[in-house]
């Protein structure tokens, strides 16, 4: 998975991996006749056609958007909405299921498209307390995850760390945020981490956590001991990751 836009015709294991890795993927699957599919969806019957299967219950938990395209008139709307969903926010796979009769019908030249919602997000400003703590910090540390790379912010982060002389550790997902020969690179913590990064985390007095979900493989099974001496500030695009009860942070954005 290259964490870029991808096209796939099957199957679910790859989609699940893309979902967990925040990798955008566009899946198009074939399906039995739309009338047969609609009957299955309405009645919950296990199977009606020879190769028919209602896919939505199977893949809805590993996709950001799923739609059964029941009419060629709606294909543009679903294509545009699926693409937007795959690339907006925390990226991930989307899935369009197209019945055989819809595939064989002619689509009109003029079709309704998907209207992209107005972006209401605003740039969060770090609190004055956090800035003051960072300025007074004697042992600051940055923990960079895949979100730094996915947002295109790796260059800005390294520029900031270089200017402030702040060392960096990375999660496994952020492995390419900073090169290993960079003087500011310390290591990678976690289950398969190195000694230096673990010491840095436990000894730092201020930790800036960027684009990392602080997985169990990164912080271990005793989250209250993670960076126990540090004031921790976390920024992540996925609010669900920030709201985890066991994430040991003092501020989040």
What are these regions (language model features)?
Residues 3-6, 10-253:
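N-terminal alpha/beta PP-like core and its mobile active-site loop of ThDP/TPP-dependent enzymes
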């Amino acid at each position: 998975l290259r964490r870029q836009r991808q096209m796939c015709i099957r199957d679910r294991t790859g989609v699940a991996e893309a979902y967990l890795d925040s990798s955008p993927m566009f899946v198009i699957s074939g399906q039995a006749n739309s009338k047969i599919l609609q009957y299955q969806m309405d009645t919950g019957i296990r199977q009606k056609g020879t190769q028919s299967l209602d896919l939505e219950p199977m893949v809805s938990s590993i996709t950001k958007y799923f739609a059964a395209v029941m009419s060629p008139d709606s294909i543009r709307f679903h294509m545009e909405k699926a693409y937007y969903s795959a690339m907006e926010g925390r990226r991930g796979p989307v899935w369009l299921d197209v019945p055989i009769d819809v595939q064989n019908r002619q689509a009109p030249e003029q079709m309704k498209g998907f209207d992209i919602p107005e972006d209401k997000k605003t740039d969060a400003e770090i609190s004055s307390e956090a800035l003051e703590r960072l300025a007074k910090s004697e042992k600051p540390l940055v923990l960079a995850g895949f979100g730094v790379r996915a947002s295109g912010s790796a260059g800005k982060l390294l520029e900031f760390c270089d200017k402030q002389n702040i060392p960096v550790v990375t999660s496994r997902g952020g492995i390419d945020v900073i090169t290993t020969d960079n003087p500011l690179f310390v290591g990678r913590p976690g289950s398969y981490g190195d000694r230096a990064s673990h010491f840095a985390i436990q000894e730092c007095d201020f930790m800036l956590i960027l684009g990392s979900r602080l997985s169990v493989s990164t912080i271990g099974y005793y989250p209250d001991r993670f960076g126990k001496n540090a004031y921790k500030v976390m920024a992540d695009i996925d609010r669900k990751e920030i709201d985890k009860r066991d994430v040991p942070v003092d501020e989040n954005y």
